[in-house]
Regions:
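Interdomain motor-coupling "hinge/lid" segment immediately C-terminal to the ATP-binding subdomain
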Residues: 129-248
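Hydrophobic positions on the alpha1 helix immediately C-terminal to the Walker A/P-loop
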Residues: 34, 38
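Short glycine-rich substrate-engagement loop in P-loop NTPases that contacts/grips substrate
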Residues: 53-85
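Conserved lysine of the Walker
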Residues: 31
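Conserved catalytic/switch belt of AAA+ P-loop NTPases
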Residues: 101-117, 124
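Structural recognition of the conserved hydrophobic beta-strand(s) that form the central parallel beta-sheet
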Residues: 90, 115-121, 143
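Accessory nucleic acid-recognition modules appended to NTPase machines
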Residues: 198-371
Length: 433
């Protein structure tokens, strides 16, 4: 498999003002694999600590966090001399050694010549638990997410089609639209968790893919009880299990009352924040106006809550993997929730911070909106064949926007104000909008 984040890691290595790098993301997203690949391709030597498998190694950060002392300790522990430019030091599962996260600040300030990458999950939770502070401004950070559609295509179908998607060559891609639709149907069910994609690429067995997804869900749910305060664990489960139902509503706004009778926001805020810190849900806020920057218009009372991955969402919902054989049904099932989940994932992978807008009267809503080229770009997701974009036109007129995007199974079409981008190409929105 290939991950697009590899290019970011290579760029980090050659950066003159390089800082220690923190690769953060939920479990099972491929952080360890990617760092091992990066080390093997780019460095003569690698020294790796996994603080979950080697709890004794956490003593590296006992006492002084002086960088030279830590390097000397590493050399003694591993029996190797570290040459700064030739050696990559990997601190894996760094959340198990919160003072190790703090130590990155001092590596940046006192020993920037060393190439250090840390990887972990739920780090904010670990730091709060140990009363440590996050080294803001002292480290470089990269988010690790599940594989996107183009990475899935590369793993399952090979480089030529994946490269054509990245190039946004719409004339070339128009000739293989049926194949792209088939691959997208598979992606909605298989998702982008690397272990699941790898197994599917080898066997094309959807039942095995679902079995692996269930294992991942069980691992996530097991972590709830291991790391979160006992008082919120059951509430976390309620929020997590509610995702399919919340997204299957016509109005996908998250409703606390759907969790249990009489549920209120203040009862679930901590559990929701924990799930977000863990990286397995993502909040898309409502904005009161489609004006840049969107963060200035956030309405804190309204949001949609998306899952980490389309495949995981499908497994949570109990959706039969065989749905990929049933024409376009996978795109419209549960009122298009898998399709909207997919678009949210693709936007996040492109570094976007999606929001959504709905009018105060409720007569118009955009599924998403992103900051784009100094203005705002509203998006409507069309899972069905009905391509009418009334809400988009209302939004564009109300906020005097010159451009809006509809994404659907229809062919690419630029009509000036409205551009239709095929669902399988929405990851290239910057090139096409």
């Amino acid at each position: 498999m290939q991950r697009q984040l590899m290019d970011e890691l290579i760029a980090w290595k050659s950066r003159a003002n390089r800082k220690p790098l923190l690769l953060k993301g939920a479990r099972q997203t491929g952080k360890t694999w990617l760092l091992n690949e990066f080390a093997g391709q780019q460095y003569q030597n690698v020294i790796r600590f996994d603080f979950m498998l080697e709890p004794g190694a956490r003593s590296l950060f006992d006492g002084s966090l002086d960088s030279k002392r830590i390097i000397s300790q590493i050399e003694l522990l591993r029996g190797q001399t570290i040459t700064p430019t030739d050696t990559l030091i990997i601190f894996d599962e760094i959340q198990e050694a919160p003072r190790g996260i703090t130590s990155l600040k001092y590596f940046n300030e006192l020993a920037p010549e060393y190439h250090i990458v840390a990887a972990g999950s739920y780090m904010g939770l670990a730091l709060r638990r140990e009363n440590e502070s996050f080294p803001v401004g002292k480290i470089d950070q990269l988010p690790m997410r599940p594989m996107g559609f183009v990475e899935f295509v590369r793993a399952v179908d090979g480089d030529p089609l994946a490269d054509a998607i990245l190039a946004a060559d719409m004339d070339l891609l128009a000739n293989v639209s049926e194949k792209l639709e088939r691959l997208l149907k598979e992606y909605l069910v298989v998702g982008g968790m690397p272990e699941v994609v790898s197994a599917f690429a080898a066997s094309h067995d959807l039942i095995e893919a679902r079995r692996l997804q269930q294992q991942i869900i069980e691992a996530y749910e097991s972590d709830f009880g291991k790391h979160a305060p006992a008082r919120i664990v059951e509430r976390m489960r309620l929020v997590w299990k509610s995702l399919p139902g919340q997204l299957a509503k016509e109005n996908k706004k998250f409703v606390y009352g759907a969790l249990r009778p009489g549920a209120r926001a203040r009862d679930f805020e901590e559990s929701l924040q924990w799930l977000m810190d863990y990286g397995i849900v993502h909040k898309v806020p409502r904005v009161s106006a489609l004006r840049a920057p969107l963060t200035s218009y956030e309405d804190l009372s309204g949001f949609k809550l998306f899952c980490i991955d389309t495949g995981i969402l499908g497994a949570l919902s109990g959706l039969s993997p065989a749905i990929v054989l049933n024409g376009p049904a996978v795109f419209t099932e549960f009122k298009g929730s898998l399709t909207e989940q997919y678009v949210a994932q693709e936007l996040l992978l492109q570094g976007k911070t999606p929001a959504y807008w709905s009018s105060s009267s409720g007569n118009a809503e955009t599924d998403f909106a992103i900051d784009h080229a100094g203005t705002v770009l509203p998006l409507e997701v069309k899972a069905a064949e009905n391509l009418k974009a009334k809400s988009l036109r209302i939004a564009c007129e109300k906020f005097k926007l010159e451009r809006c995007v509809r994404t659907s199974l229809a062919a690419y079409r630029d009509e000036g104000t409205l551009v239709n981008i095929p669902l399988w190409e929405i990851g290239q929105i910057d090139k096409l909008a």
